[in-house]
């Protein structure tokens, strides 16, 4: 099977929401909230939602946000979140390709680093991210849920 990686466009909202149900089905946004957030994301040049599309089906996605910065010679940094692959399409390299493209976008944006957060603690997921070039030794993440 072959797939393509592209930035999500206005018409991809329903596909993204469907994919996100595999991340957090319990807190899906209302249609109004989703539409408002989608409009804000689409108008922000620093926010990239990448899609992995296989045979016309949006099978995987991740979000990359480039953050302007006043340290590190004013070079921005980037965050990757919401990495998800439809269960029927796992193990085909989609997520690896998405992460590779996200890192390329960060590099093209002049970022000095890209960070990735995951809520998964299982070895398979953590080893997947390590295999994609990320490490868990350089930084310690803390989260305060609001």
List the predicted regions and their residue ranges.
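Conserved beta-strand in the GNAT
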Residues: 51, 57-66, 79, 84
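Conserved GNAT-fold acetyl-CoA-binding loop/helix
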Residues: 17-39
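Conserved active-site alpha-helix within GNAT-family acetyltransferase domains
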Residues: 96, 108, 120-138
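Conserved N-terminal entry element of GNAT/NAT acetyltransferase domains
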Residues: 1-11
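A conserved beta-turn-beta hairpin within the catalytic core of GNAT-like acetyltransferases
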Residues: 69-80, 90
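Conserved acetyl-CoA-binding loop-helix of GNAT-fold acetyltransferases
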Residues: 91-104, 131
